[in-house]
UniProtKB/Swiss-Prot annotation:
Designated gene of the protein: Prss38
Family to which this protein belongs: Belongs to the peptidase S1 family.
Protein's name in the database: Serine protease 38
InterPro entries the UniProt entry points to: Peptidase_S1_PA (IPR009003), Peptidase_S1_PA_chymotrypsin (IPR043504), Peptidase_S1A (IPR001314), Trypsin_dom (IPR001254), TRYPSIN_HIS (IPR018114), TRYPSIN_SER (IPR033116)
Disulfide bonds: 81-97, 179-247, 210-226, 237-265
Enzyme class: hydrolase
EC numbers, comma separated: 3.4.21.-
All copies of domain Peptidase S1, residue ranges: 56-289
Any one GO CC term of the record: extracellular region
Entries under Pfam families matching the protein: Trypsin
First and last residue of the signal peptide: 1-28
UniProt keyword list: Disulfide bond, Glycoprotein, Hydrolase, Protease, Secreted, Serine protease, Signal
Propeptide cleavage-removed residue intervals: 29-55
List of catalytic residues: 96 (charge relay system), 146 (charge relay system), 241 (charge relay system)
Organism per entry: Mus musculus (Mouse)
């Protein structure tokens, strides 16, 4: 998450009891989307439909097949960010996870893994072919345009343990959805880390309420979403960046957000802020359609993750980036 300097303000304190009173959702005109409107980029493989339906801060351990699209991004052998599988060659993550000054060869991707200490027979390791950063990254906001497309050198082999997530329709209405986020971030404000993939159910919070909570100096752009469980203090934390925020609709999971920034961990008045996937949908689809696959090589299966014992926390200035 990110820590932006701002005051809560009187309106923020007045709003807090309202958030505790009942579950809060981003609401609009009630409208249901048929299952076919989910955007799949994976060909014949069904997206957003794990075979098994089943810790972030205060979260619970995730089962191996519950979130099969989850990705672990590593830098120099350490987990630094999460991500999600879009198709056999493409992963979606956060732009701030990639430093333009670092060599691409120092990054790699793991899929089919829930414990960072050890791989299993479903774990696959991939080198990165290229990373495409959204052109507005940090242009209008310190962490605005926080979206990255990662193309792999070889194709992911799909199974019950490794599957893509669906992209949402561009006109998706976020109303009464069951939304979850996953990741390997810190599990306590004191910096305690864990190796197990964690999950947390996070209610969506309307942007205008989120803006009041953060104050005017921590401005939110229309491309951003907010989510947190105000009652239980479940939230995203450092190391969760790039991981997906997914919501279930018509028995299919859709990715609506990318973990981006916030203020500390488990701060009851500061929800996690996510890049809104629907806002960037046309950009994502355009690049995945026009860019050819890299020269094909055999996928690399890992027997053990490379030195993946420590969660690496990225800090960008005074913005504590997840």
């Amino acid at each position: 998450m990110a820590a932006l300097t701002s005051g809560l303000g009187v309106l923020g304190y007045l709003l807090f009891p309202l958030l505790l009173a009942s579950p809060t959702w981003v609401t609009s005109v009630s409208r249901r989307h048929p299952k076919s409107q989910a955007n799949s980029l994976s060909g014949d493989v069904a997206c957003g439909q794990p075979v098994l339906q089943g810790k972030l801060l205060g979260g619970e351990f995730a089962r191996d097949r519950k979130w099969p699209w989850q990705v672990s991004l590593h830098y120099s052998g350490f987990h630094i960010c999460g991500g999600s599988i879009l198709s056999a060659y493409w992963v979606l993550s956060a732009a701030h996870c990639f430093d333009r000054g670092k060599k691409l060869e120092t990054y790699d991707i793991y899929v089919g893994i829930t414990n960072l200490e050890k791989a299993n027979r479903h774990t696959q390791w991939f080198e990165i072919y290229q990373v495409i950063i959204h052109p507005t990254f940090q242009m209008y906001h310190p962490i605005g345009g926080d979206v990255a497309l990662v193309q792999l050198k070889s194709a992911i082999v799909f199974s019950d343990f490794v599957l893509p997530i669906c992209l949402p329709p561009s006109d998706l209405y976020l109303i009464n959805l069951s939304c979850w986020t996953t990741g390997w971030g810190m599990i306590s404000p004191q910096g305690e880390t864990g190796n197990e993939l964690l999950e947390a159910q996070l209610p969506l919070i309307p942007r205008f309420q989120c803006q009041l909570l953060y104050g005017l100096s921590s401005y939110l752009l229309p491309e951003m979403l907010c989510a947190a469980d105000i009652k239980t203090m479940k939230n995203v934390c450092e190391g969760d960046s790039g991981s997906p925020l997914v919501c279930k609709q018509n028995q299919t999971w859709l990715q609506i957000g990318i973990v981006s920034w916030g203020r500390g961990c488990a701060q009851p008045l500061y929800p996690g802020v996510f890049a809104n996937v629907s806002y960037f949908l046309s950009w994502i689809r355009y690049h995945l359609q026009i860019i050819p696959n890299p020269p094909q090589i055999l996928p690399s299966l890992s027997s053990s993750p490379k030195n993946t014992l420590i969660i690496f926390v990225t800090i960008m200035g005074h913005l504590l980036v997840l």
